[in-house]
Regions:
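Thr-Gly-centered strand-to-loop micro-motif
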Residues: 38, 136, 182-183
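Anionic group-transfer/hydrolysis microenvironments
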Residues: 40-41, 139, 178
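Carboxylate- and glycine-rich phosphate/diphosphate-binding segment that chelates Mg2+/Mn2+
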Residues: 149-221
Length: 221
């Protein structure tokens, strides 16, 4: 696959080895101390530590929060917010699927403006820009890295709350490695010009797709 970038309106970088550009993204944000938010599975796989090592090698401090569960709760946001405040970090890196993305965006609000994320439920209640955030999706999931939403589970009401704000459009992100975002465009009828563009950019023979998993593992090693 040939690396490429497009702006919608966030800057999105796509391509094998893009994770190595994380320090470059952070420097453009003026960041020097990262809070890396992810889940336990990617920590066990070594992906979290690899991302952290890139930042450390560039002279940046890194704190890690990996207690994000599927369908993350208000309590998880509160814990991650406290971890961010205690760390002294000045930007957030979200790594994983939709759950870490939603938590990171919520922390970007509560760590800056205070209160509980429940106070921002609904539309346009976030008063300004959130804490600088780099999102690194590893799944073909909700697309939280490019949306104006954060969805958090409120167990006290047995309810999923949604925070909508144009301020969630992140300062930067690095869209890395995972071909699952693009593979569907090999077979589906393109609904939009962007789909056709992505399908054309995915220069990978269909007969070789069986080896994709092994290829992805090598890219992380």
């Amino acid at each position: 696959m040939n690396p490429f970038e497009f702006f919608i309106p966030q800057n999105i970088t796509v391509g094998a080895g893009t994770l190595a550009k994380l320090p470059e993204c952070a420097k453009k944000l003026g960041g020097s101390h990262a809070m890396l938010i992810s889940g336990p599975t990617l920590r066990k796989m070594g992906v979290v530590d690899k991302a952290a090592d890139y930042l450390k090698d560039a002279g940046m401090a890194v704190d890690i929060f990996t207690d994000v569960e599927a369908n993350p709760s208000v309590t998880t946001v509160e814990k991650a917010t406290e971890a961010y405040k205690d760390s002294g970090a000045d930007f957030i890196v979200a790594l994983g699927g939709g759950s870490p993305m939603d938590v990171a965006k919520a922390v970007g609000v509560t760590a800056k403006y205070g209160g509980s994320i429940t106070e921002y439920e609904g539309a346009n209640k976030v008063p300004g820009k959130i804490i600088p955030l780099i999102a690194i999706p590893t799944t073909a999931g909700t697309g939280s890295e490019v949306t104006a939403f954060s969805v958090i589970t409120d167990h006290s009401r047995d309810y999923k709350l949604t925070v909508f704000s144009m301020n969630f459009f992140l300062h930067m992100r690095s869209w890395i490695l995972n071909f699952s975002h693009l593979l569907r465009h090999l077979w589906q009828q393109p609904a939009e010009s962007m789909h056709l563009f992505m399908r054309r950019r995915l220069m990978f023979p269909q007969q070789h797709l069986l080896f994709l998993t092994q290829w992805q593992r090598k890219q992380w090693s």
